[in-house]
Amino acid sequence: MMKMTMKMMVHIYFVSLLLLLFHSYAIDIENEITDFFNKMKDTLPAKDSKWLNPTCIFGGTMNNMAAIGEPFSAKCPPIEDSLLSRRYINKDNVVNWEKIGKTRRPLNRRVKNGDLWIANYTSNDSHRMYLCTVITKNGDCIQGIVRSHVRKPSSCIPEIYELGTHDKYGIDLYCGIIYAKHYNNITWYKDNKEINIDDIKYSQTGKELIIHNPALEDSGRYDCYVHYDDVRIKNDIVVSRCKILTVIPSQDHRFKLILDSKINVIIGEPANITCTAVSTSLLFDDVLIEWENPSGWLIGFDFDVYSVLTSRGGITEATLYFKNVTEEYIGNTYKCRGHNYYFEKTLTTTVVLE
């Protein structure tokens, strides 16, 4: 009985020690996070920091993109930030928004589920700053700043799908509405005809349309129409995006790699050599070529030796450039590696004096 008691005491001691260490470590992490945001606050321009309440914790800044004539929404930075969100995501918290600049103006009528919501973003809203304040049920407050910037959405985004790539999962088409959340629903059209989401040929998950059992006939124009409700006037707002889908037959992804075995150079002069991949695939960017130095490191845009990649019409080339050949390069062997999802090939070339 005494032995069991001693074992239990030792066990309890070690468990307590581990809990104490973990608690101490957690406190250190929290303190480091707070210090990080305090330092960020210190770097703010005076014209921004003057709007902050000195009694509130600072929770960072965010830059959000917006599209003219479309809805725009933004979360308060401490709720969106991965370091702080677990502290401040709580349905009982209150989030207030203000527009700041020359003056400050409350925006409580432009709030949806705690997020800033602008139903029709105009050029007058561009580059504006917004201050949000999260008030917890304990009365603590934390503030963040959001800046909005205009970005014009692409009119129609081309997308290519090759049969046999991942047919059992289907083709995923993403409706690229990234400027506003809280939409009601999304309807999809193919070639101006509404798609019936029957969960057989077509299914829908959030912003994605999934086309099952892909076929060449699935090529076409796909439009997604996103429906919103305005906070104030309850009018339906519709925003659209477009994809041009081209379904192609399964391709032959084999390719031929071409490279001279020697680089003839002259000391003190520049030199270059090109490694070429010739593909029969319709996917012109199917093959990627990389150069490796004698130590096996990839060569990028270094000062003395660098590589430039080009691709056109099924031919991919990577040219290795020597800015100024010195004796240390003589005898070095460089590897050209061509690869795609299916195949990989390598060839080598050696630097020799002419």
From Swiss-Prot:
Pfam families: Ig_2. Residues 249-348 form the Ig-like V-type domain. It is found in: Secreted. Residues 1-22 form the signal peptide. Gene3D superfamilies: Immunoglobulins. Residues 68-150, 158-240 form the Ig-like C2-type domain. Glycans are attached at residues 120, 124, 185, 272, 324. Disulfide bonds join 76-132, 175-224, 275-336. One of its GO terms (cellular component) is extracellular region. Induction: Expressed in the early phase of the viral replicative cycle. GO terms for biological process: symbiont-mediated suppression of host innate immune response; symbiont-mediated suppression of host type I interferon-mediated signaling pathway. Keywords: Disulfide bond, Early protein, Glycoprotein, Host-virus interaction, Immunoglobulin domain, Inhibition of host innate immune response by virus, Inhibition of host interferon signaling pathway by virus, Interferon antiviral system evasion, Repeat, Secreted, Signal, Viral immunoevasion. PANTHER family: INTERLEUKIN-1 RECEPTOR FAMILY MEMBER, X-LINKED INTERLEUKIN-1 RECEPTOR ACCESSORY PROTEIN-LIKE 2. Belongs to the interleukin-1 receptor family. Interacts with host IFNA1. Counteracts the antiviral effects of host IFN-alpha/beta and key IFN-inducible proteins involved in viral RNA degradation suxh as host OAS1. Acts as a soluble IFN-alpha receptor and thus inhibits the interaction between host IFN-alpha and its receptor. This is Soluble interferon alpha/beta receptor OPG204. It comes from Variola virus (isolate Human/India/Ind3/1967).
